Amino acid sequence: MAELSTRYNLPANVTEKSINLDLNSTARWIKEPSVGGWTVKWGNFVFHIPNTGMTLLHHLKSNFVVPEWQQTRNLFSHLFKNPKSTIIEPFLALRILLGVALKDQELQQSLIPGFRSIVHMLSEWLLLEVTSAIHISPNLLGIYLTSDMFKILMAGVKNFFNKMFTLHVVNDHGKPSSIEIKLTGQQIIITRVNMGFLVEVRRIDIEPCCGETILSESVVFGLVAEAVLREHSQMEKGQPLNLTQYMNSKIAI
């Protein structure tokens, strides 16, 4: 009778073992206070988030601003002149960025169905909730989120960060400064500004008669400092740099 045999086995990859990937780390959002901000752990990333720009955003949203800042208030009037807009903290703006980075992979790549469903669940959790964990069946994780898939997922997030750094700071030369994505019920706009990345989430209403999308006045927005993402991205030659290279950018943030 023919029997199964393990006569020939390739030696285990020692390097792979030493990495000791925690696949469940994608389903956990760990936020801890630090000096001047927060530390956030998600996946194999550790983000050091300063409390940068919060005071400035609140000041721009008030009516007591210096004349030089009026241009910024006019450009982003739906944020700074809108009583229905809400400022969120930097770690929540980062969470939205990560959700968009996953959604970008889900929409653009040919992922196997099981893996795609996990990416979808993770992106929806990051974008729509503020909970510290999401329950995904260990069996599902073990089958579809292997160590190789985990690495692909994390590499995709880094690639999205790299894409963000190809943006120019808001300018008067017509060069692209924003990434936009439309999802069910919301539009997310990521704009490169002097201090980093302005993240805004606009609610979208569908008009019953003609099916057109109408942006409602309800919007949340926050600022992620450039340094938060810089340490996790790889700048290529010729990519735009920050404020020191943009003397023409007259925005206040």
From Swiss-Prot:
<dbReference type="GO" id="GO:0016032">
    <property type="term" value="P:viral process"/>
</dbReference>
<dbReference type="GO" id="GO:0016020">
    <property type="term" value="C:membrane"/>
</dbReference>
<comment type="similarity">
    <text>Belongs to the filoviridae membrane-associated protein VP24 family.</text>
</comment>
<keyword id="KW-0468">Viral matrix protein</keyword>
<keyword id="KW-0472">Membrane</keyword>
<keyword id="KW-1032">Host cell membrane</keyword>
<keyword id="KW-0946">Virion</keyword>
<comment type="subunit">
    <text>Monomer or homotetramer (Potential). Interacts with the nucleoprotein.</text>
</comment>
<protein>
    <recommendedName>
        <fullName>Membrane-associated protein VP24</fullName>
    </recommendedName>
</protein>
<keyword id="KW-1043">Host membrane</keyword>
<comment type="function">
    <text>May act as a minor matrix protein that plays a role in assembly of viral nucleocapsid and virion budding. Unlike Ebola VP24, mVP24 has no measurable impact of host dendritic cell function.</text>
</comment>
<dbReference type="GO" id="GO:0020002">
    <property type="term" value="C:host cell plasma membrane"/>
</dbReference>
<dbReference type="InterPro" id="IPR009433">
    <property type="entry name" value="Filo_VP24"/>
</dbReference>
<dbReference type="GO" id="GO:0033645">
    <property type="term" value="C:host cell endomembrane system"/>
</dbReference>
<dbReference type="GO" id="GO:0055036">
    <property type="term" value="C:virion membrane"/>
</dbReference>
<dbReference type="Pfam" id="PF06389">
    <property type="entry name" value="Filo_VP24"/>
</dbReference>
<dbReference type="GO" id="GO:0039660">
    <property type="term" value="F:structural constituent of virion"/>
</dbReference>
